[in-house]
């Protein structure tokens, strides 16, 4: 049976488009048929799982097969989004779209900065910080495959530009909670844009 998937079509929470999948296997890619009219589409988080069952023609980009060859299992991959983007880009010459992988996790907005203890980001221990800027600086200095930025609303965004996993852990206690984050493994996203700047059709 068909399932729904939500595409983010802009930077705001209200900028989304829900479309139906023609088979359940495409759920793991966050891509589906039926969306058009926007210059950029962003998938849901791309799970690290077995994608070998997704056929090259299961999804059409601008009316053409989205892949030139089937994907392998990504169950042990730490960069599933990047692998999907690379596979889509192998067929760019046919469908005319470019895929880009990225990842980001943004904290909740807190009334004041607090970091109760150390946290672990992608396996690296980030020392207890006493200001938001100090925490951002420590992440940028120490964390492997992750950068941090302080937003105007005082939230903090952890991000990368390759779609690699962002793994947040809190072995010592409540450091992440006080920062406004939740311990988890966060998979990356894939964006689609046509290389000629026209609207993408999926």
Features from the language model and the residues they span:
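Amphipathic alpha-helical coiled-coil/heptad-repeat segments
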Residues: 1-202
